[in-house]
Amino acid sequence: MITHHFSDGLYAKESQFSEGMAILKHVHDFSHLSILAKGKVAVMKGEDVEVIEAPACIEIKAGVTHGVKALTDCVWFCIHATDEKDPSKVDDILIGV
């Protein structure tokens, strides 16, 4: 389940996913923060894999290919600086090609 949260100049994408589910590898043009609010995940950044347990906050640098796999049921937030408030447009703006 995805929930979008917006404030002045900020966007938070809340993802709730079950054990075994994954967020596909992707890359952003800008650095951002990700917050693991609940659960345990394996985070892939480039060639590195790190197991993280909530609560945790990690930085994802611009240009780094990354993905997440849930090792337990999880709540994960990606926090981005943007003025865009249309959920149908934020991924197009924030995810690099």
Model-inferred region functions:
Residues 37-38, 54, 72:
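A cytosolic small-molecule/anion-sensing beta-strand core signal
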Residues 29-30, 48, 64, 72:
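A generic "binding-loop/recognition-motif" signal
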Residues 11-28:
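Conserved short histidine dyad/triad with adjacent acidic residue
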Residues 29-46:
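Glycine- and acidic-residue-biased ligand/ion/polar-headgroup-sensing regions
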Residues 40, 65, 73-75:
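Structural motif
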Residues 1-4:
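Transition segment at domain starts
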Residues 8-10, 71-97:
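Double-stranded beta-helix
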Residues 46-65:
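Short acidic-glycine-tyrosine-enriched beta hairpin
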